[in-house]
């Protein structure tokens, strides 16, 4: 196992370190898919306000690549489609009817595909999980038919007050291993699983790479710099460990999993801890009664959340 050590970086001494134990967060009344989360997105709407959707219903697609869809994270009704300047898509907000409804079964939907590689790519595209990948350079969603020189899985997080990646992965180790195995089918190159110093994470048939030091030791760009730097003629992809867990669960169960673990932390947090919530959950619902002063909050970033502002 290769080991890399960074001596310089960011190490901010912030009070309010979260308890590394996972608690259930408040259930959201609304959820959303946020347009600004996706660099270079040119959306084409596939639903209208007032329309009923289930988990996995395509809400919009990429105009240049219609195979890339962005799906509803729950069963509900489209409450609003919000646009900004020059009609840029800001958000699609869903009124939640059910968080327990499984939605579309992708294994059944594509069960007649004989090629495993084609099956994996099709399921990732149709479930919306394709947008979990980012290309380097440019940090954009990869085109549907592209193949990277290598794939980097970031199985660590060195941002201040972030969740412990090993804790979250070990809670669903089978799903993580399944996700790695499926993602590896998307490239002829190597899959780099990058983890923290002294992490016990191992995945059968795959190498892990250990990184030590302050932030940005946990960033994909740092890992690429040491292991397989991208350039103008070579594209590599990156993906986070919670997205790998979701991919693993997709192929183990057939259904899209939108659960994510976030860190509620900082000096104003009443009870700094890890919360289990959902992709696109409303912060208004999630953070009610969590902070002493909601004018200044900090949330770690392993998930896309509905952005809000407080007066």
Predicted regions and their residues:
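Generic structural motif
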Residues: 37-41, 53-56, 65-80
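N-terminal, Lys/Arg-enriched amphipathic/low-complexity engagement segments
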Residues: 1-46, 61, 211
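Single conserved hydrophobic/aromatic residue that forms the stacking wall/gate
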Residues: 297-311
């Amino acid at each position: 196992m290769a080991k890399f050590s960074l001596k310089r970086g960011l190490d901010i001494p912030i009070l309010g370190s979260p308890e590394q134990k996972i608690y259930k967060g408040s259930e959201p009344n609304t959820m959303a898919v946020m347009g600004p989360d996706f660099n270079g997105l040119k959306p084409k709407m596939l639903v209208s306000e007032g329309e009923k959707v289930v988990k996995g219903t395509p809400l919009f697609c990429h105009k240049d690549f219609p195979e890339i869809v962005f799906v509803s994270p729950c069963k509900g009704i489209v409450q609003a489609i919000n646009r900004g300047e020059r009609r840029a898509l800001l958000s699609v907000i869903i009124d939640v009817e059910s968080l327990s409804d499984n939605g579309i079964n992708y294994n059944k939907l594509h069960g007649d595909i004989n090629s495993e590689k084609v099956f994996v790519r099709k399921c990732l595209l149709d479930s919306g999980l394709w947008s979990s990948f980012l290309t380097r350079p440019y940090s954009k969603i990869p085109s549907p038919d592209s193949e990277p020189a290598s794939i980097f899985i970031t199985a660590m997080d060195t941002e201040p007050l972030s969740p412990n990646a090993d804790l979250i992965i070990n809670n669903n180790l089978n799903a993580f291993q399944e996700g790695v195995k499926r993602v590896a089918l998307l490239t002829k190159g190597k899959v780099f699983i990058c983890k923290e110093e002294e992490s016990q994470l191992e995945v059968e048939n795959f190498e892990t790479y250990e990184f030590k030091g302050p932030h940005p030791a946990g960033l994909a760009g740092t890992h690429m710099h040491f292991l397989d730097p991208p350039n103008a003629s070579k594209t590599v992809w990156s993906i986070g460990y919670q997205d790998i867990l979701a991919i693993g669960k997709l192929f183990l169960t057939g259904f899209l999993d939108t659960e994510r673990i976030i860190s509620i932390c900082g000096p104003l947090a009443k009870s700094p801890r890890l919360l289990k919530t959902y992709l696109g959950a409303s912060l208004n619902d999630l953070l009610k009664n969590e902070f002493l002063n909601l004018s200044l909050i900090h949330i770690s970033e392993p998930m896309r959340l509905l952005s809000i502002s407080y007066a």
